[in-house]
Amino acid sequence: MDVLDYLDMSESSEKFHVSVLSEKDKFKIESADITLKEGDDFKRISTIRNIFDRKNVIFYGKYLSESFVKLETASGKFELPIVNIDHIYDQISKIRNQEKRKTLSCIHISTIQIVLKSTFLKGLDYPISLAITDERINNPKEKIIGIVHGNLATVTLKFSVHLGFAIPLTEEDLSRSISLTYKAYRNDLMNDQKQGFSITYAVSYALANSHHSIQFANKDRIYLDEIFKQVSFTEKPRPISPIKPNGLKFLKKKPSNLEDLIGVPRNHLSLQPPPLRVARKDSEESSSTSVPEIENLTKQVKDISSYLKDRL
């Protein structure tokens, strides 16, 4: 690491960062012409090529819960937390490897499976709705990850949803981030204290040290180059073409097709000029364009064409 004048690296449950600094003359020792173009810099020096790569720490887990529901809580909307933060922190505290334990920063939630099963005879009408919601989202419609409407007359109601995203372990009120919400639409089947059905749910998840860990699930390290490989680069905005005195904007680059130019589908466009109406002597209707006017316009167009040809 003699090529570096400065190196700072740290990783915790809240943040990971690497910062390096090196004098330009030290790059010449490696015979590497360094530029800052598209991130093509330190990765060309063999001694520090992998300095920005990091260990990939993943602990896979699955949580299963089964409980009976009293109908007093099912007669209205009721929320059941899917991610129990106390349980998660208890798991983390029991990880033997302290170095890996202190780097865990997020929980990647994969699949949530839910089964509702009635405690009464098959065929009794008991409609119920079930939804998985992201309570961090403010919009009521957009917070719904998945929803199902069913009837426990069939005894069981099964529901599965794939999330595929991560939540920081430092998220405020993490236990309420992902919720199971259910609502029954009948309150006269049993007394409120009776337990009309059970809820069994399983959550597949992973505790990891990076938001990118699952992308490298089968690798021991997280590679910086691959993270940025799929990043979209934003080009510099091109200046708007100047406006000519006649008010028309002339494009410097010809559009690839007509839709790109005016934003209207091709089948909505008429590429043929409107038919020219010429007044006849025996017509009762008067035309907006007379024959002498047309002849005069034609002569002007020819004169302009000849002028431009001579000038060009």
From Swiss-Prot:
Its main location: host cell. Keywords: Coiled coil, Host cell junction, Transport, Viral movement protein. InterPro entries: Caulimoviridae_Movement, Viral_movement. Residues 278-307 form a coiled coil. It is found in: Host cell junction, Host plasmodesma. It comes from the Viruses. The keyword Coiled coil applies. GO terms for cellular component: host cell plasmodesma. Residues 266-293 are annotated as: Disordered. GO terms for biological process: transport of virus in host, cell to cell. Belongs to the caulimoviridae movement protein family. Homotrimer, through the coiled-coil domain. Interacts with VAP. Transports viral genome to neighboring plant cells directly through plasmosdesmata, without any budding. The movement protein allows efficient cell to cell propagation, by bypassing the host cell wall barrier. Acts by forming tubules structures that increase the size exclusion limit (SEL) of plasmodesmata, thereby allowing viral ribonucleocapsids to spread directly to neighboring cells. This is Putative movement protein. It comes from Cestrum yellow leaf curling virus.
